[in-house]
Amino acid sequence: ILKSLDLIDNMNDMEQIGVLGLHIEGPNISLEKKGIHNADYIRILSDDMVDRIASSGNKTVKIITMAPEKAQPEHLKKLKGAGIHVSIGHTFAKYSECVSL
């Protein structure tokens, strides 16, 4: 994730070369609903990682997919505050868990 953020952050004209932004899918997803994702990379996002993603803002990161039951509310607020669309995925969360966020 960090390598991708650094690469995209340092591009001068992303649209000219066909990069519209990143969709980060994971690593904050349910292990039981991981799909094709490698279980070794599934983990809770650290404060530092959330700060780094948010600092790139929606110029770089357009969407991040997370499992609500694994997400920390303050992380969601920070990402949404940076203009990043937080999407629900790879989850066993109930409707009530999702709407409470």
Pin down the residues of each PLM region.
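Histidine/acidic-residue-rich, glycine-tolerant segments that coordinate divalent metal ions
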Residues: I1-L101
